[in-house]
Amino acid sequence: MRQSSQARETTETKIKLNLQLDESTNVSIQTGVGFFDHMLTLFARHGRFGLQVEAEGDVFVDAHHTVEDVGIVLGNCLKEALQNKEGINRYGSAYVPMDESLGFVAIDISGRSYCVFQGELTNPKLGDFDTELTEEFFRAVAHAANITLHARVLYGSNTHHKIEALFKAFGRALREAVEKNANITGVNSTKGML
């Protein structure tokens, strides 16, 4: 089974994260940031991933360090779980509606880290979650995993719905990208490596 367990401890955060790419029944998220827990749960469920996260952070300051560091550890786990990337689709994309909002995510498991984020999040805060941290999370995952990730809110009026559409689309796009494909021999690249 393709999986990874990693931990990261700094003076700001303490993170333990387990990711299973081929098992989807075990999802348990505890970051101390309620809205972020909800989004990670949606990502795992819609991507059909097993994901367990335990995080403690300096949320008395704000949630920035916790959200970014969870993104870093998730990216590291994804990179390790994919091993040599043989036989995977490599690319994945998904449009996901959430009521009036539409989110889009495209992924290339390329070995090159890049993140493009486009979306107007008009409400600056949802509970204890600063909405600008949505971009920070995606950027942290992309850089740690060495993937290219494009995330875009096409339209919508409710900030919660916009972010939810993105996290669901992220799960679905990543599922497509990491899926094994019997028609692909080796890695899906003319270079012979990713």
Curated annotation (Swiss-Prot):
Q: Which GO terms describe its molecular function?
A: imidazoleglycerol-phosphate dehydratase activity
Task: Please state the Enzyme Commission number of this protein.
Answer: 4.2.1.19
Major place of residence: cytoplasm
Alphabetical GO biological process terms: L-histidine biosynthetic process
**Subcellular location per the Swiss-Prot or TrEMBL entry:** Cytoplasm
* Catalysed reactions listed for this entry: D-erythro-1-(imidazol-4-yl)glycerol 3-phosphate = 3-(imidazol-4-yl)-2-oxopropyl phosphate + H2O
- On the tree of life, the source organism's domain of life is Bacteria
Q: Which HAMAP family match?
A: HisB
Q: What is this protein called?
A: Imidazoleglycerol-phosphate dehydratase
